[in-house]
Amino acid sequence: MAEWTLGAVLDAIADAVPDRVMTVSGERRSTYAQTAERTRRVANFLAHNGFGVHTERAELQNWECGQDVVALIMHNDLYPDMVLACLKARVVPVNVNYHYTPREVGELLEYLSPRGVIYHRALGAKFADVLPGGAQLLISVDDGSDLPELPGA
């Protein structure tokens, strides 16, 4: 492999030590193999929905982005999985600090114009009113809360 990506590194580690624990959150433990599989499935889902690179780097100015942007509003161990999944799909993951006020998140999302938003279900209600209407994909990640998904997720 001429160039290594973070996704390729994860997959190589998963091949070498599939049952080694990668993340721990409360009682939940995820192995490298589980994480590699989860990130592959999410990356494929994003790609299947048309997310990825639309203009290659060589055709862009330094300040331009030729990839779709996905905002991540998350708070636990599945956050790195979603970052890696976005990178595998060649999508730009952008962290949105869930400690921000809804107004601050709204301003950030307006600036970013993300094509998709991945959020933990417990955070959905807090930011429902400021999520971008132009987002074509809204993914709710189960975080053990009893809250319902937002409409369209």
Regions found by a protein language model. Name each.
Residues A8-Q34, N49-L60:
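AMP-dependent adenylate-forming
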Residues A122-A153:
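ANL superfamily adenylate-forming
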